[in-house]
Amino acid sequence: ADWLEDITVMPSKATGEGAIITTETLPQHLTFDETDVAREGTRLKMNPPIRYANDRETLWRQLKAGTIQCIATDHAPHTLEAKALGFPGAPSGMPGVETSLAVMLTHAKDGACSLEDVVHWMASGVADCYNMVGKGRLEEGGDGDVILVDMEHAHPVLDENTWTRVGWSPFRGRELVGWTQVTVVAGVPVFERTPETGHKGRVLVQPGAVGEPIVMTPWR
């Protein structure tokens, strides 16, 4: 990531006629290192691969410096049966969507970054990079997408609580804060996690019943 310094730029700040180059990293690359790969094996096989602790710290440094602008998930829900093929046959990639926010908010709770950083990397900055109309901010005329989270109580990641069809998470066993309590799309609650639902939570609407396709305008 170091060689990208002074090359990447947020589209909203781009000037001149040069190329707009944006970058992203994943919660997995900001969390795991070679010791996790040694323990978890092909569960953590992905491309680019999980590397060493000093590489992870380089990503953090360049993320906070603005060279890397966004947090993505690279969600690739391969089955455990496929992952059990071992090296090199197991496919690269892993589930990542449903733990992404809690992982990053846990990093914020632990002092690696601020809450405002997470909002920028996962909401406003992403909307900027992709010119998403009405997304990334709470403001008049926007789409009204909101997530309410619990920053006080930690819960472990359990495979049996995942929503992905493949039923596992690379973060299994990790204690995370920042779990979503309510998700609102276009002003409509679509998911909740309460004592009655248990930690897995429940969906409140049918898939596709709320929200519209994301509109992205050209950069220039």
What kind of region is each of these model predictions?
Residues 1-71:
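Histidine/acidic residue-rich metal-binding segments in metalloenzymes
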Residues 1-23, 78-95, 127-135, 206-220:
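Short, electropositive alpha-helical surface patch
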Residues 25-26, 75, 151, 174:
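Fold-independent oxyanion-binding glycine-rich loops
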Residues 30, 80, 156:
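Conserved protein kinase catalytic core
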Residues 43, 70-71, 76-153:
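His/Asp/Glu-enriched, well-ordered alpha-helical/loop segment
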Residues 44-55, 91-95, 169-175:
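A short acidic, glycine-rich active-site loop
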Residues 49, 116-117, 158-163:
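Short, positively charged
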Residues 86-89, 143-211:
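C-terminal cap of metal-dependent C-N hydrolases
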